[in-house]
Amino acid sequence: MGIFSIANQHIRFAVKLATAIVLALFVGFHFQLETPRWAVLTAAIVAAGPAFAAGGEPYSGAIRYRGFLRIIGTFIGCIAGLVIIIAMIRAPLLMILVCCIWAGFCTWISSLVRIENSYAWGLAGYTALIIVITIQPEPLLTPQFAVERCSEIVIGIVCAIMADLLFSPRSIKQEVDRELESLLVAQYQLMQLCIKHGDGEVVDKAWGDLVRRTTALQGMRSNLNMESSRWARANRRLKAINTLSLTLITQSCETYLIQNTRPELITDTFREFFDTPVETAQDVHKQLKRLRRVIAWTGERETPVTIYSWVAAATRYQLLKRGVISNTKINATEEEILQGEPEVKVESAERHHAMVNFWRTTLSCILGTLFWLWTGWTSGSGAMVMIAVVTSLAMRLPNPRMVAIDFIYGTLAALPLGLLYFLVIIPNTQQSMLLLCISLAVLGFFLGIEVQQRRLGSMGALASTINIIVLDNPMTFHFSQFLDSALGQIVGCVLAFTVILLVRDKSRDRTGRVLLNQFVSAAVSAMTTNVARRKENHLPALYQQLFLLMNKFPGDLPKFRLALTMIIAHQRLRDAPIPVNEDLSAFHRQMRRTADHVISARSDDKRRRYFGQLLEELEIYQEKLRIWQAPPQVTEPVHRLAGMLHKYQHALTDS
């Protein structure tokens, strides 16, 4: 396909984006807003942002959710801006510096919260800065400006949502149904690979792909939840299916690992059974029915615990899958499955990364302030706003450098494009609202095509062009003001990019070590006799950390295997029949404290000391288990865990 060709699937969203821009423009001028540009800019960003992220037309609910986050972020930013102005209006320089710190603080929070919700915090950071900078000439108009800004943004969001609803947004439900069927087949095929005990790299690739697909299914669940309240029952089932899918992966991989030391546990009966190939979910359904009969015939005691647990989880998965596809009322059996264990939320392992983002945003905003004050440039304030926007939005994404480059390309492209609109198109449409709407619709349509193709600079060009063309009420055409605004955007993006390059993010290795130690802590915490603690569901949180590890260290198989082994150890120890007595309970608490010290240690020496202490305690614990005559279901997983920690001691303690 050529660079200038238009794919059919991209046309509908391009029309949707053009409609959102035209609606916001018409409403803004109809209600005599002072700066309809903010409404148009908001409509464009809210509509185009999800499309750029998705690489195509976003699914139903995505634009509404982004608009909701933008409203929240704007209100938080406006309130923060008002508080800062009221408290420090007599010290303008201090007021701007506090705003720079506020932008950094919001970026820090956005780096720690869920990626879907981080947009609101990033927006809150630079909204306060925009308000403080804009009201510098007339501070007494701050409340009026804050109210107007909120009103214009809400109008833009409503217009984007109306355009989304007008052009029948895509539902993700069919994609979810197809993925549920396909995922079940892939789970069965993974178990086949693990029972065959073939090439380790093939197995690693298979379970790695399944972890990614399960994580993607969880993202689809979020989209389905945003789409409509009628999918509430399907959403509950999908949440449970996420845990079941992760359980299937864990049991399959444990089956593979068990055969490294005790291959005789998997009998020929099960090896022959899993030799039968499957292609569809219907094939898996038939095989599971036969497998349940085989287990009933051989008996639970003669069935390996991993296969027994896998079949139980696959059966529940099938039951809930049918409920998701049909979206029928939840029956008693399903309700029993859905009333599962409470999920545990794990502490973020990216605190150091978040602090780097804080300093990047704060320093870039302070650098912009110094540049503005030193040069006295009339558009220095515009450069500062772009610095805050780029750093606040770039820091929460995996590759901030590329986001900054995208903004630089976008602002450079906006200069000639904005010049065309400022000098030729808009002056010639002054007498006709219809012509003005058509001209902006054409801009939105073609940039909407480019945004869906993720063309470098397309998103930045859309926002930057709308920001510099004259869409105020009344319109005034001062070329020097236009040029200042356009150059201010470019300079701001370049300064932000410079700070991102200078303030290096070297937190990757530290994050990886913290993640691995969190896996160790989870495995140690599973050794408990506390009933409430044993019922906690750590699996989604553990696999979320594993997914982060896979993204941070692509292709690092030893790290993935170590993390997966810790997850398997956690699941096995969680179900192990540990003898109940005060001596072991007290020692469990001691080991958990030591594991927490390993995670929180700030130096390598302390970390090694606490890790060595943990290894010694595990040796003592194994001796205690022998004294209390614990069964092999307890002693064997503990012995395997201690062996793994001894083997990977340096990887878990050294920076």
Swiss-Prot record:
The keyword Kinase does not apply. Keywords: Cell inner membrane, Cell membrane, Membrane, Transmembrane, Transmembrane helix, Transport. Its main location: membrane. It is found in: Cell inner membrane. One of its GO terms (biological process) is carboxylic acid transport. One of its GO terms (molecular function) is transmembrane transporter activity. It is a multi-pass membrane protein. One of its GO terms (cellular component) is plasma membrane. It holds the Pfam family FUSC. The chain crosses the membrane at residues 13-33, 38-58, 69-89, 93-113, 121-141, 152-172, 370-390, 407-427, 431-451, 459-479, 482-502. Belongs to the aromatic acid exporter ArAE (TC 2.A.85) family. HAMAP family: AaeB. Forms an efflux pump with AaeA. Could function as a metabolic relief valve, allowing to eliminate certain compounds when they accumulate to high levels in the cell. This is p-hydroxybenzoic acid efflux pump subunit AaeB. It comes from Shigella boydii serotype 18 (strain CDC 3083-94 / BS512). The gene is aaeB.
